[in-house]
Regions:
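C-terminal interaction segments
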Residues: 205-266
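Structural signal for well-ordered, non-membrane alpha-helices
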Residues: 12-19, 48-52, 99-110, 139-146
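Short, helix-capping/interhelical loops that line the mouth of catalytic, cofactor-
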Residues: 1-2, 50-110, 158-159
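Short, contiguous alpha-helical
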Residues: 26-71, 120-176, 216
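Basic, Lys/Arg-rich alpha-helical nucleic-acid-recognition elements, primarily the DNA-binding modules
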Residues: 1, 5-34, 39-42
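Hydrophobic packing residues in well-ordered alpha-helices of helical domains and bundles
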Residues: 4-7, 95-98, 131-134
C-alpha cells in the first residue's frame, strides 16, 4: 500500500530530526499536555507495535491492548499507562526500538490486503485505514516535536492522506459531540505543498474553506487552533467545523486554545 510508504517517509523525517538534535532533546517538553519528546516517541512506539499485532489477527491485539486499556479505565493517562509496557526503555534505546517499530509496521503493511479488517482501540477498521491512522498520528505528534525544537518541517504531498481523513470525518465530528450536522457541507480548495490545488465537496456550496493543505491538516489533527492559521473560512458550517474538527477516533477532544501551539522562537 502506498500509505505504508507515506507512513515510513513521515517517520523517517522525524527520525532524522531527532538524530540531528541528539538524545539530549528527548527531555524537552512539548506543548501537547506537557509531554516530553521522549513521551511522544514512547507513545508512537507503543501504537506502532499495536498496529503490527492487530494485523496478525486472533487475540494478538487484545493481548497487547487490554493491560494498557485497563490502566486508562482506572484513571491513568496514556503516558502513565505506557510506562510498564516500555519497561524502563529510554534514551537511545527507545529511539532505536521506535525506529525498529517503524520498519516493522512498513514491512507488515506494504503488501497487506487494504480491505482486511483489523482491531483497534475502537471499532474495527480496514488495514488501509489503520496504516493511514499511523501516518496521521506520526505527523501530528511530529508537529509538537518540530515545534518544541524550533524547527520547520519540509511538508510533502503525502499530507493529502491526512486532509482526506479530515474531510470524511466532517459528519462524524458533530455526531461524536451529539450535535446536528450543519448543512451545506463546506467546499474545500487547498494548496498542496507541491503547489497543486486540491478540492473536495460541492464547489457551489455557500460554505467554503480556502488555504493551505498543511494548515487544514493542522486543524483537523488538533495541533493548531484554526484562529492561529490563515485559513479563509466562509459560512456557519465551515466555522463550526473548524471549531470542533477532529479526524481521529475516540471521544470528543477539544482543539488547543488559541495561541497555545506554535513553533518555539516564533
Amino acid at each position: 500500500m502506498e500509505q505504508a510508504k507515506d507512513f515510513f517517509d513521515e517517520s523517517k523525517d522525524l527520525h532524522e530530526l531527532l538524530n540531528a538534535e541528539g538524545v539530549g532533546c528527548l527531555s524537552t517538553a512539548t506543548m501537547f499536555k506537557n509531554w516530553t519528546i521522549e513521551d511522544v516517541i514512547g507513545h508512537l512506539y507503543l501504537f506502532n507495535y499495536g498496529a503490527v499485532e492487530t494485523l496478525k489477527g486472533g487475540d494478538h491485539f487484545d493481548n497487547f491492548w487490554k493491560p494498557i486499556n485497563d490502566q486508562v479505565l482506572d484513571g491513568k493517562s496514556l503516558v502513565e499507562a505506557q510506562v510498564p509496557w516500555l519497561n524502563g526503555v529510554t534514551g537511545n534505546q527507545l529511539l532505536d526500538d521506535w525506529w525498529q517499530s517503524v520498519e516493522d509496521v512498513f514491512n507488515a503493511y506494504k503488501d497487506a490486503d487494504p480491505k482486511k479488517r483489523v482491531k483497534g482501540g475502537g471499532p474495527e477498521m480496514s488495514a488501509r485505514s489503520k496504516i493511514t491512522a499511523r501516518h496521521m498520528e506520526t505527523w501530528a505528534h511530529g508537529q509538537e516535536v518540530f515545534d518544541a525544537l524550533g524547527r520547520d518541517r519540509e511538508e510533502k504531498d503525502r499530507i493529502k492522506n491526512l486532509v482526506h481523513m479530515g474531510v470524511i470525518a466532517y459528519g462524524w465530528t458533530f455526531v461524536n459531540r451529539k450535535l446536528a450536522i450543519p448543512e451545506p457541507t463546506p467546499y474545500l480548495i487547498l494548496n498542496a505543498p507541491s503547489g497543486e490545488v486540491w478540492q473536495w465537496n460541492d464547489k457551489e456550496s455557500s460554505s467554503k474553506i480556502e488555504g493551505t493543505a498543511v494548515e487544514f491538516a493542522q486543524v483537523v489533527t488538533q495541533v493548531r487552533n484554526f484562529a492561529d492559521t490563515k485559513l479563509s473560512i466562509t459560512g456557519e458550517p465551515a466555522i463550526e467545523w473548524m471549531k470542533y474538527a477532529q479526524c481521529f477516533a475516540g471521544p470528543p477532544e477539544d482543539p488547543p486554545a488559541k495561541g497555545t501551539r506554535y513553533k518555539v522562537g516564533n
